């Protein structure tokens, strides 16, 4: 029987506010077994960029990463946000190790080609070194992964945290029974976005497509669910979308084939 592993992705809103960060650290530390944490940090990057006089440009909710912005996100994601989380977990007895994709070549990416939009120094994941992560995990290390990768040519690349979580979970599913948890500001996928208790407990691909056609699921939840189904089809055992405060309670929406 294969060992179980939980990959948890948390957004910047959770890790950038003291109260929600403290709860996350406590809840994550309480999760037993092997685990990996992937975090965002976009709001902090926008704030620091503004303080440095650098304008943040967004298209369809995604950051345009020019050379100056790349310096900011590298500092903020790989430094400020990541090390705050690592220090907090160490204080709770979790042997956390902060990583970007460049560290030990754990995630290699390719710079996104220019199509309708030039996103700049943004990376699309090519390879995750699952054996390296597994070696760390078996030594009792808990990887804490920032949303940064590299191209192997000396360039850092800004990379979507949802994508890093999904690609990491898929790669590790060759070695573990992986549960991928996307933490969100809602209790799960909702039938009615104005009713926080209208959680859909389970959702299949066919049901998802029908919900999209009916307008029940829309906006940013669509790519999140697309990533979830892709992970399931690639061998991830289970995908859950839930509140960050519910990660230890086994609640939320479960994604089924």
Swiss-Prot record:
EC number in record: 2.7.2.8
Top-level EC class as recorded in UniProt: transferase
Binding site for substrate: 41-42, 63, 158
Cellular compartments annotated: Cytoplasm
Gene3D superfamilies: Acetylglutamate kinase-like
CDD domains per record: AAK_NAGK-like (cd04238)
SUPFAM superfamilies (alphabetical): Carbamate kinase-like
A GO term, aspect molecular function: ATP binding
Pathway this chain belongs to: Amino-acid biosynthesis; L-arginine biosynthesis; N(2)-acetyl-L-ornithine from L-glutamate: step 2/4
GO cellular component: cytoplasm
Record's keyword annotation contains ATP-binding: yes
Sorted UniProt keywords: Amino-acid biosynthesis, Arginine biosynthesis, ATP-binding, Cytoplasm, Kinase, Nucleotide-binding, Transferase
Recorded superkingdom: Bacteria
A GO biological-process term: arginine biosynthetic process via ornithine
Principal localisation: cytoplasm
Record's catalysed reaction(s): N-acetyl-L-glutamate + ATP = N-acetyl-L-glutamyl 5-phosphate + ADP
Marked site (Transition state stabilizer) residue numbers: 9, 224
Family: Belongs to the acetylglutamate kinase family. ArgB subfamily.
HAMAP family in the cross-refs: ArgB
Its biological purpose: Catalyzes the ATP-dependent phosphorylation of N-acetyl-L-glutamate.
Protein name: Acetylglutamate kinase
Gene: argB
